[in-house]
Amino acid sequence: MKKYLKTDEWNIIEDSFQADRMRWSESIFSLGNGRFGQRGHFEEPYSSDSYRGAFVAGITFLDKTRVGWWKNGFPQFYTRIPNAPDWSSISLRLIDEELDLAQWDVDSFNRRLDMKAGISYRDAEVTSPRGNKLRLHVEHIANMAHPNLCLIKYSVTSVNYTGKVSLVPILDGDTANPVRHPDEKIWNILRSGTTSDCAYLWTQTRREDAQICYAMTYRFFKNNKETFANPIRIEKEKQAGFSVGTEVKPGDTVTLVKYIAIASSLYYERQDLIEASVAEARNAQSTGWDALEQEHRNAWQEIWDETGVSIEGDPEAQQGIRYNIFQLYQTYRGDDPRLNIGPKGFTGEKYGGNTYWNTELCCVPFFLLSTPKKIAENLLIYRYKQLPKAIENARKLGFDHGAALFPQVTSNGEECHSEWEITFEEVHRNNMIVYAILQHATLTGTLEYIAHYGLEVMIAVSRFWSQRVSFSQPKQKYVILGVTGPDEYENNVNNNWYTNYSCMRCLETTLSFLEIIARQYPDEYARICSITNLNYTEESERWRDIIERMYLPEDPERGIFIQNDGYMDKVLQSTDAIPAGERPINQYWSWDRILRSCYIKQSDVLLGLYLYYFNFDRETIRRNFEFYEPMTVHESSLSPHIHSILAARIGKVEKAYQLFLHATRLDLDDYNNEGDQGLHITSMPGSWLAVVRGFAGLQIQGGTLKIEPVIPAKWSGYSFKVNYLGNTLHIQVGKEIKISLTAGKQLNIQVYQNVYELKQGLDLTVNRKDLS
């Protein structure tokens, strides 16, 4: 499915109608604004293969755990994001005919997603079975300035038809979850109805009792003049709306503007949902499309001004990186610490809409570096608020004394994963949360978050590791047994190097910040010691002993770290040995065959070298990269950008570029042949990080911002903004490196080996070096 879409730096363009790509296209053209989102399905009914999906942030339902072999510690229930009632539905009816692109001839078709403006456009010329020709034009906005509003402008022009055209906007509560519950209805309709100008639909999930209410108003035009046709009210058990129509002749155009307000029990008292949604829908109708669209465009412009990356000479890369930033912001606004980012966002039900450690790996550093807003901090507060349940989760698995194991998958703090080799064994996820807290302190230069929240998390995670390690008498070292590392194609192994190493670094981080907070925030330190019942002398001694005597498997002859015990016993061969028709291997091979192979799903050892880069010299990184990357199939969306960053840092710029393209266009070119299920939202910031931390070589060392830029051969230059210690820098890389301080007073920056002082209004220009 590669290269189906047209290349355009600001637009995603589909210029033909291909029914066999429908579900994938629906994923690609998804829209959202962080409060709600919807797959890019047609507004009108479509009788062939389609996945109509709508999702509302923070609204979940309890689903019973389904496993073949129950094990102690599995969750009884877990939360999932439900496919919400459909707010976008608009039917188009002629005399005795209804538009259905699966049944009508599609004479021309063009769909465009304008990423700069955040607007989806669809144009088509269609012919009905009776020979009636129409032209369609549809615009769709998930309003970024008004997070409860969705706007749809639906226009139809008669080419050869004479007669009545009716447009039927409805709110449809008759939906199911097609991925997991195709035959079960998740929603109960509490109330639905219409007034003279408004329709509403009030619903509740069958389990967990979350509620949402939609309200809809509309305006109707004929040849650009508003027409007050007598609407027919539609009031059914699970639907509410109107049918509005008028007589047309060839050349006439009728337009319906649908204003939808979406209110949920996350933000409103339940008894106020109808009133709140109706008031907002009516206010939107009064404000009008043009003003609401402009406010929406302005909101997107603010995002692009902060986070935009400009790439010169490579439209495919430019399109891809903008698409990834666009979809991330469509999923997460960053203004509510009760919310997080699901791997599929609002583009599909897979993974239940829950949170993984992907957030801390990719999203937190992106938001820390790309915007001065406290978006990343809200993601960290989300984890802090779930600390009590993480402690309870660890207790269920036999840990005590306030040890915490954060869930592999969650939306409410409770574990929502039920594969034992992941749920119980992929425990390295704990370290990623501590690492993200460290990144926050490093990049903001502030300690308030750690003093008020983060240190409690660090203590609880360190207590987990204190109990999870074992002491090997033969080795006289601490070992960690029965784990799954980041490479999920290796399960239940001993001494995964990344897990062991990141455990050490986690304990070191906790000890370091205990000392810092004790000095700088003595009152907070005393409070934390009290509520955690910390025995500093005893516990710190234990943690230091683990750090000093942790076993780290390595191969001295090759000069590499060994991924885990037993890995070197495998037949070691590159991915070139895999037949082309058997990729991705997780779609063609048995699990037994995958486990016995040497093939690596995603960065494992190399992830540790990326996160703790300054602890290793360049040659060590190069040796490990050259050993492990050829055996990596990159079948996790988290993999390509990590490898791209490391490749750029060790001078393999063109290899870095190929991996960057993989990360950047993973969904647009459907690398993993699974785009029909939704997008890979939480790995999308990786493409931005690959530019900033990879090609630009941005790192923080000893409190100094450092860059070592390189440029792929295809590019003539690139530029981006970055935030550090409350300062905003604009960095341009071409034949020269130009750096300006656009916000802030003064900052030192190291470019290659030299340190320069930046001041606002005084740009810095440095010659770029060849580091290959």
What function would you assign to each model-found segment?
Residues 347-355, 404-452, 463-542:
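The feature captures the catalytic groove of carbohydrate-active enzymes
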Residues 323-330, 382-389, 456-468, 505, ...:
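Alpha-helical scaffold segments in carbohydrate-active enzymes
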Residues 1-351, 589-593, 771-772:
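Acidic/polar, glycine-enriched structural segments that form the non-catalytic walls/loops
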Residues 23-56, 60, 358, 362, ...:
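C-terminal capping/lid segments that line or modulate ligand- or cofactor-binding pockets
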Residues 307-339, 343, 500, 526-566:
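Gly/Pro-rich turn-and-neighbor structural signature
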Residues 332-347, 373-435, 441, 447-452, ...:
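Helix-terminus loop motifs that line ligand-binding clefts
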Residues 355-361, 365-384, 452, 508, ...:
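Active-site core of glycosidic bond-cleaving carbohydrate-active enzymes
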Residues 76-129, 134-135, 618-622, 629, ...:
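Non-catalytic C-terminal accessory modules of carbohydrate-active enzymes
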